[in-house]
């Protein structure tokens, strides 16, 4: 259950100040976000072929179900039952910010845009895992001042260059599960394994630089947008695994970078044919030394072997960031013509390339390497006279390409990897009516 309340107010100048040179915007934002998160994850740990559900569940078998013992040591029997993960979590977040932006015309052909935003974010959490084996309450506050500074210059009546510096911010928060401290390991008689996932995680900041060009060419029949950018991350948030089994959450990579180049081109080749192309080139890497435990490697060890799990850590410096394909492309040709009856016919050819990428920062070749794929789509549309009825014929993934759109590897317990496949070839017919 999620309950979110937001409120935002803006004041925008309706007449430029300072002899028509200054436009301004000021505003405020508020958000309250509450979650009731109840998870009952089952797994056939005893290999009976039948799950031993919680007895209070309506679908549980009365002669083969689980009743939790809240006493000691009975509460720990949960780890020998058919459970993967159990939690009752009630996190909440309250956020507010105030901001302002001004655009100042230095001349008829140049402008300076600057903005400032102050944000304060407070989180609270109340978590109980595996019924009553562990409970956790925490509260924290992050505040950050972010900014933007952009210079624009009109090279001609139809082209503009810009340079932008921006700082962004993602607040920290709390985890459902996290590692035991070394003192807790010693007290419990476990092998000592320093924590890699903590009760809370830090805020993430990113400093970006972008330089670009926007131009209208060919007497306005072509629009080209070019941009080169760099992102420098501090405390990049990512999903991490702890040496203690069944424990993982969000952690922070101290330093990482991403840079890229984007091309957007749209051209009216003729009165009937339009060409539309979007290209993106990315390069990313972790730039600081940072040790990460891959749950896929650690899963072979369990309770009592936390030190062995800890020893499997790897330095991810130089690894690619997650889900950052080096090259993507989307190319469209659209042809429009009118029949003698007045019906508008639109045909679209689309080519999509999604480059290969690593689905996690661990860059494990067994599960993280996601191959590239190419898609070809066709659409033939008819907009009949009167603009009331429309009919579209579509062939999606015309070559029936196999591909993985994305994947996710569990960081908590079972180390399973789920794949999101692209749809196979599809034939679609769409009838539309405007009224």
Q: What are the roles of these predicted feature ranges?
A:
Residues 11-14, 23-31, 89-231:
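Structural signature of Gram-negative outer-membrane beta-barrels, strongest in the C-terminal barrel
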Residues 22-26, 112-114, 161, 222-226, ...:
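Transmembrane beta-strands of outer-membrane beta-barrel proteins
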Residues 275, 350-362, 382-435:
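C-terminal beta-signal and adjacent terminal beta-strands/loops
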Residues 2, 14-19, 107-109, 156-158, ...:
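Outer-membrane beta-barrel channels and translocator barrels
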Residues 12, 108, 112, 227-232, ...:
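Gram-negative outer-membrane beta-barrel transporters
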Residues 1, 40-86, 123-142, 173-200, ...:
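Solvent-exposed loop segments that connect transmembrane elements
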Residues 28-34, 118-122, 165-171, 180, ...:
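Transmembrane beta-strands of outer-membrane beta-barrel pores
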Residues 154-162, 193, 198-261, 265-274, ...:
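Membrane-embedded beta-barrel scaffold of Gram-negative outer-membrane proteins
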């Amino acid at each position: 259950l999620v309950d979110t309340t937001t409120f935002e107010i803006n004041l925008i100048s309706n007449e430029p100040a300072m002899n028509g040179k200054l436009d301004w915007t000021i505003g405020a934002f508020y958000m309250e976000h509450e979650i009731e998160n109840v998870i009952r994850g089952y797994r056939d740990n005893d290999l009976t072929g039948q799950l031993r559900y919680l007895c209070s569940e309506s679908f549980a078998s009365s002669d083969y179900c689980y009743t939790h013992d809240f006493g000691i040591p009975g509460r720990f029997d949960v780890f020998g039952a058919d459970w993967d993960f159990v939690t009752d979590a009630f996190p909440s977040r309250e956020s507010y910010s105030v901001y302002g932006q001004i655009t100042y015309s230095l001349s008829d052909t140049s402008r300076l845009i600057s903005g400032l935003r102050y944000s304060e974010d407070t989180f609270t959490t109340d978590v109980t895992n595996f019924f009553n084996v562990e409970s956790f309450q925490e509260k924290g506050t992050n505040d950050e001042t972010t900014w933007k500074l952009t210079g624009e210059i009109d090279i001609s009546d139809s082209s503009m260059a810009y340079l932008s510096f921006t700082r962004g911010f993602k607040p920290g928060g709390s985890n459902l599960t996290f590692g035991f401290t070394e003192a807790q390991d010693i007290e419990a008689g476990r092998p000592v394994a320093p924590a890699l996932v903590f009760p809370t995680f830090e805020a993430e900041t990113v400093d970006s630089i972008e330089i670009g060009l926007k131009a209208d060419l060919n007497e306005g029949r072509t629009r080209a947008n070019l941009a080169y950018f760099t992102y420098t991350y501090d405390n990049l948030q990512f999903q991490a695994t702890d040496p203690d089994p069944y424990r993982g959450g969000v952690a922070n990579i101290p330093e990482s970078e991403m840079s890229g180049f984007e091309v957007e081109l749209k051209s009216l080749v003729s009165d009937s044919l339009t060409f539309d192309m979007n290209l993106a080139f990315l390069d990313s890497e972790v730039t600081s030394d940072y040790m990460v435990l891959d749950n896929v490697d650690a899963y072979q060890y369990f309770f009592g072997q936390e030190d062995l799990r800890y020893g499997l850590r790897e330095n991810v410096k130089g690894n690619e960031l997650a889900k950052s394909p080096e090259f993507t492309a989307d190319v469209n040709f659209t042809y429009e013509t009118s029949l003698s009856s007045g019906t508008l016919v639109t045909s679209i050819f689309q080519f999509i390339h999604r480059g290969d990428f690593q689905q996690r920062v661990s860059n494990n070749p067994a599960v993280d390497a996601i191959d590239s794929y190419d898609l070809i789509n066709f659409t033939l549309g008819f907009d009949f006279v009167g603009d009331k009825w429309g009919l579209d014929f579509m062939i999606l993934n015309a070559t029936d390409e196999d591909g993985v759109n994305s994947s996710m590897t569990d960081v908590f317990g079972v180390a399973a990897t789920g794949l999101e496949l692209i749809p196979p070839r599809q034939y679609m017919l769409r009838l539309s009516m405007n009224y």
